Amino acid sequence: MSDESSRLSLLWETIQRQEDYPIFRLTYLSRPVKPFTRADFDDIESKSVEANNARDVTGLLIVNNDRILQILEGREDAVRALYTKIEADRRHTVVKLVSAMEDEVRLLLTWSMVVRGLDGAPKHLLEQFDDVYDELLAAEGESEISIDQIDLFKEIALFGGIPPEPTRKVGAGS
């Protein structure tokens, strides 16, 4: 089976799979203590893919200079436990919970974890990300993440025209 066939097969299996639990989505913002390097991105992504597959968690981490936004999805207990661990992580500070909610669908269907730095991203993506980040940071309490914001985050994950490889193992953690 070719790489493309394997990728499409994994995508199809994931799409067909019905979750046997409500999807819990948590979004948070933070600031890194020091700038992330490419090696940091690679390390976070490789460790997160393995750990998130074991928990049946999917995620997207976006970093733009001193701004971090992450979306995590999965079982509520698994996502909340992961968030507690993230809050204690000394690589970042000013951790703010933006949104924590149940949903009927998983938005980050095939990605155990995608890490995206915005170096080299088109100007409009940088500006839109910074505007959304500032808006969410300034909001009192929790906010509802809009479909437009989710679409922006997915566009960032796909920027450069290269979709992230599916990394979620179907049935993992179940």
Name each region found by the language model:
Residues 2-174:
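Charge-rich, low-complexity N-terminal segments
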